[in-house]
């Protein structure tokens, strides 16, 4: 068993650390055991855990958790860069946010991280021509998290949105890699009626 765990860690050390943190969380706080098992320990990979978490947050009477989860899993399977970006976002938060002490925290508790992962799936759907599905994801992210990101907006990797309250990112906005945002940020339109009308944020900007 030790050899198997070593092999897993060499393949995905981020996921292995998340699982270790989840097991410790259950020992420390047994009352959250069911929640932590459902979100982390029942899953074999980060993408499976994220599929569950995003679906659990976005599901509604209009679209079931099963359907949302299938959409997310299909997106992850078709576009591995989505999961790579989710890892980069996770590490960015862990490294930059003094309130983040474990990789586990953003997946379970940080709405900024959760909102960005849902946006990434919505953006993938948009690029594949599934605009109404993408708009549904945008609507639910706005309703649940208070983060309104147009699915056509282009956002890089390693993103941290601290507190993630009242965030608006418009259709033609571009956000580079390794960007950190605080709350109440609006990348709104310039007044043009069409084409390129939103701000562009370069790499490494706070």
Give the ranges of each region predicted by the language model.
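Beta-solenoid/beta-rich acyl/carboxylate-transfer cores
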Residues: 146-160, 164-180, 184-186, 190-206
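Terminal amphipathic alpha-helical/low-complexity segments used for targeting or macromolecular assembly
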Residues: 1-140
